[in-house]
């Protein structure tokens, strides 16, 4: 699933597509490449980190029939299947926070190229002449053994795979191919 932006419209598409994309599948690849950011990392993480605490079966069915949970009971769509996340040097801001978070919590393999390192929270206000000024008001830090400021410190993939001009000209997605191969090793 490609997450185009870390914003409400993209979140709604992600939540809709998550259920369909996971049906009958064993693994999932999320893609935040070429994503300018936004604010929805925590909501996406909630969908891929929610634990399975129970399952249901219809009355009289074999109780060994596992894996079904009533979708109307879920607050958000969720998956617990193996996941890899794609990022690149055009993953900015909240897409970088997503990449750092995915790696920090160990949810799967981060694949691609290091993100740009452009992570801050900004607000904006208008001046009397009608221009708008944006000001940073918050820094973001990786929550691991050595907290690092995400500003100027992009997320470093577990598998660094460049997307070359030759790949682009032949429409070959080497990063996606490597992410898929890595997932197949984990599910087999």
Where are these regions (language model features)?
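Cleft-lining beta-strand/loop regions that shape enzyme active-site pockets
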Residues: 1-128, 168-174, 181-187
């Amino acid at each position: 699933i490609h997450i185009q932006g870390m914003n409400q419209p993209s979140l709604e598409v992600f939540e809709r597509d998550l259920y369909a994309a996971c049906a009958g599948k064993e693994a999932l690849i999320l893609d935040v490449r070429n994503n300018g950011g936004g604010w929805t990392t925590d909501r996406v993480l909630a969908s891929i980190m929610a634990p399975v605490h129970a399952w249901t079966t219809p009355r009289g069915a074999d109780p060994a029939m596992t894996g079904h949970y009533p979708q109307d009971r879920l607050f958000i769509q969720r998956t617990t299947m193996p996941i890899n996340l794609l990022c690149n040097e055009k993953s900015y801001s909240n897409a970088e926070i997503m990449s750092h978070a995915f790696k920090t919590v160990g949810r799967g393999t981060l694949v691609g190229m290091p993100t740009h390192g452009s992570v801050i929270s900004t607000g904006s206000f208008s001046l009397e002449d009608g221009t708008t000024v944006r000001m940073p008001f918050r820094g973001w830090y990786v929550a691991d053994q050595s907290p690092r400021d995400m500003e100027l410190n992009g997320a470093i993939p577990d598998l660094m795979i460049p997307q070359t001009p030759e790949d682009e000209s032949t429409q070959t997605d080497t990063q996606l191919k490597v992410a898929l191969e890595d997932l197949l090793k984990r599910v087999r």
